[in-house]
Amino acid sequence: MPANPGDLVRSLRQRLGLTQEEFAHEIAVTVSTVNRWENGHAAPSKLAWKVIRDLARRRGLTAHLQRPQQSVNGR
């Protein structure tokens, strides 16, 4: 399992076979938001994690999707 939120988002997006643009559209955020998540400059909110989990379930990914408790950039 990926070690940080950005890696988890990227891994999940890739497993879903989606581009950043497609993923952003599916979860109703901007492409720059997805990019910031994946590059460790921000982390998804609790609501965003819920939407991401719902998308994964709808697409048949049943892997355990826990919201990582790790801080972003040491904050």
Residue spans of the language-model regions?
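A detector for short, charged/polar N-terminal pre-domain segments
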Residues: M1-N4
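Secretory-pathway ectodomains
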Residues: V9, A28-T30, I52-D54
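Short basic helix-loop element that most often maps to the first helix and adjoining turn
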Residues: V9-E22, R59
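Short alpha-helical DNA-recognition segment
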Residues: G17-R36
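Short, conserved catalytic or interaction motifs in soluble domains
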Residues: N39
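DNA major-groove recognition helix of helix-turn-helix/homeodomain DNA-binding modules
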Residues: S45-Q66
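Helix-turn-helix/homeodomain-like alpha-helical modules used for DNA recognition
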Residues: L65, Q69-R75
